[in-house]
Structure formats: structure tokens, C-alpha cells
Amino acid sequence: MYKGWDSEALPIQSEILNEILLYCYLTPQPPIPSETTTATSPTNIENEISNLDNSENLEELKQLSVALNIDRRCNICSIVNLCLKQNKSWIYDYSLLCYKCNYAPKTPLSLLIVSTEFLMLIRERFPNINFDGLFLNNIVSIFDFHVHFFIHRCFANTVNDHIQSENITLNHMAIIRSTLLKEDTIPHIKIKKFLTKKMNPKKTQSSELNKKLTVPMKTRFTTLLFYMWSGTNVFDRVPFTDLTIRKHRFIKNLYSNKTDIELTAGPILLAQIPFSITKNKTTSVCLLCELMAASKQDYLFLKYLHQSIMDYCQNNLKMIDRVQFVIADIFEKTKIHTHVKNLSDYSKAIFDNEFSFSDDNFTLDTHVYLILRQTGTVGVYKHFFCDPLCLANCKTINPEVLFNTTDAGEIQDLKVTICYRNEYLSIVEKHVWLAIHLFKAFQIIKPNHKNKTQITEFLKDFTNLLALHHFDIVDPIFTVNYYV
């Protein structure tokens, strides 16, 4: 019985899951020419094009970019249509998946869960249809899942302004393509028009559905979180050598057309901005957003952590000091750091997860401790107070929907109700997501005269847009320059 967001159904040894992970790695870039070579070769556009043409992953990038064309069919919609022709009742499981996705944060972990559960649903229900080789034969790419579930949201209610919705999706695609191809410029998207957009009154989630989602699931995806990012620069301060070897051995044994993968970047194509970078103790993948999507226990801990920082004392301390003091107090109270000492490999600690502290306020175990150790004070500060994507994720997530289910005898009724009500409400407006996506792209682009002017113009309108939608964060001008 499909329940959605179920970690027990997605073990890290799942072949479907690892296949998706494999095709979310990029092929390594060719080595940079030596200084001697570059000194004798004049830098001009012809040489740059020639170097690009010789790139080992050019064909891969071209193929990945196909899904980022607005006039190309949605492959996920095509698969859904094929499944419905075979069995119309399949839509009930699909509707539950979409409903859970609707209240999930936009994180790599969320996308991995959604795409894996989708492929499991179609393979288990339709064994007579050959769905093998979807990635191998370039029938789908991970960007098909990006667009279908998180960008265009093909499953959601019909909007009144179809053309604006189409243009927003078009702009999202252009942003991803420019970062994927590592272009020097970001698409020039003017967001000033959104400042005068009439805000629709927010609808609330159906209370009837809320009443049905009362049974907590024993779901937790932290082991998967460590697995997917082990051996990458996302965990550059917490080594997982054995876990990394296990993962690389598993995915390299899969039948594929990939001869090599960019190990340190990890499955970066799962991220909203498919570009792996670290800057001032932050990474382009926020581990706290990932943790928020892992379980209700972890969501509640982050909620407690944020409130503790806000309530730390009545003096006018800087937020970074509040963060540091609160984390130090939590570590001192839980004592987990005394058990999980400095190790050269934390893989065993992940699988054992034998140390835990719990009281009336929060639960903290080895998994959360190691994530906090990796993110550090700056990472926590950025997540709670600086990054608009993190705040949008905090506004979007609904733990009662994501991590709860219903009694086994009622789950089919729940799926039918979700399907026929067709209420997939967007918590954060689509144009706000677009502006945030553009902001994240500006964080990773190399500054030049042209895009510096573009960023300055954008930030004026972006700051006003955030205020209009009640995003209370540190000045984005600081964040865009110092963090990723």
C-alpha cells in the first residue's frame, strides 16, 4: 500500500534510487590546460568554442538541456498518460505523491524521493510495460522531474493567466540552462512587474484532509541524506569514507553509458542550481533544508533551534552570536560530541546512530549532530536568517502532510479525495519562486561588468518583493556576495 514519503520503501540499496543518483552526476570536465599552453594560445572566441567542442561532457550537457525547452513535451506527463490508459485507478497513488510533493521543500532530497517513488509506482503497478533504460536511453532526465513536480507543477490547479505561468517556467528553464552550461551571464529577467501584481487571498488547506492525516509515519531519510552527499564537498568537514566507497561501488556497477562521474560535486543535478560550489563556509546545497525534508523529528528540532536562537536573551546580541551560543548549549546538554569523537570516518556512526538525547523540547541524535557539525554556525545563520530559498522552504513545508498518513482502511478514501478535490495550493507564489531562483543563480556567477549592473538592478526590486511577501531576512545584498 503506497503511503508516500516512506523511507522504509526507499532503502539506500534500491536499484531505482541509485540509478537516479548516477544520472544526477555530471561527467568530469577535461583538465585545464597548463600555463605554458595557455600562454601561447591567444584568448579569443574561436579558441573558447574549440575548447568547448572538445569537452568530454558537451554531448551530455546538450542532452540534459533538451528537457529545458518550453516547446518540448513533458515526458512525465506522457508517462502518466500512458499509465492512465492502462489503469485509471493508478491516478489515486499518483495524486497522493503530488499532494505530498506540494508541501515538500525544494531540496535535492525531496526531488530524489519524489522521482524514486514515481518510478517505483509505475514499475510495480505496470510490470507488463518496459520502463527500463529511461535514463540510459535519454527518454527522461532528472530535469523532467524538476519541471513536472517543482517548477511548472503540471499536476496543480489550472491558473487563470496561462501565458504568465508559461513565461515563468520558461525563465526557470533559462536560469538552469545558463548555470548548467556555466555561462558568464544570467538571463535578464525583470521582476519589477511582479511588485504590482495583485496578491490573491491565500486559501487554507482542506481541514477534512487534515483530519485524515493523523497517523505518524516511522519515516526518516537522514541515512539517505548522508548516502547521497557522502564523498562530496557538501560534507567536506565530516568524512564518510566507507559509505562513499559503498555508494560509488553500487552506482558504478549499474549498467549505464557513463564512463566517469564528477565525484566531489555529487548528484548536483538534483539541486535547483546545478552547480557545486562552496563559499565562506556555506555550500550550494543547504543541509538544513535537506534535514527539514527528512522527518518530522528533524523538522521539529530545527523549529526548536530557530525559536531558541530568537529567544536566547533580551540583550541586543548579533544573530551570529545567538546561533553560536545556542548550538554550544545544545551540544553541552546532549553530550553527543563526547561519544562521537574526531574520527577519520563517520560511516559506522551513521549506521549505528546509537547516541541520542531527548527531552520535552527536542530530540538530537548522532545524525543531527553531524549535520550541525558540518554546517557550523555560519551555515545555521545563513539558513535561518539570510537565504530566501531556505525561508521559502520553511514557508512551504507542512510536516503533518509530509510525515503523516491515515489508518490503513482509510488511505484509499484519502487518495480518492485528494484526486477529486484537485487542491494543490502553492504556498509561495510562482513568481516569488522565480525571483528566488534568479537570486541563487547570481550567487554562483563570476562577476563581470555586465552582470554586476544586472545584479544591482535586480536586488532593488528583489528586496521590495521579499518585503511584500513577508520574507524577513538579512539584506540580500550581503547574502548574494558572501554565501551560496
UniProtKB/Swiss-Prot annotation:
Residues 286-390 are annotated as: Zinc finger 2. The keyword Methyltransferase does not apply. GO terms for cellular component: host cell cytoplasm; host cell nucleus; viral envelope. PROSITE patterns: HERPESVIRUS_UL32. Zn(2+) 2 binds at C286, C289, H383, C390. Keywords: Host cytoplasm, Host nucleus, Metal-binding, Zinc, Zinc-finger. InterPro entries: Herpes_env. Residues 74-154 are annotated as: Zinc finger 1. Zn(2+) 1 binds at C74, C77, H148, C154. Its main location: host cell. It is found in: Host cytoplasm; Host nucleus. One of its GO terms (molecular function) is zinc ion binding. It holds the Pfam family Herpes_env. Plays a role in efficient localization of neo-synthesized capsids to nuclear replication compartments, thereby controlling cleavage and packaging of virus genomic DNA. Belongs to the herpesviridae UL32 protein family. This is Packaging protein UL32. It comes from Human herpesvirus 6A (strain Uganda-1102). The gene is U36.
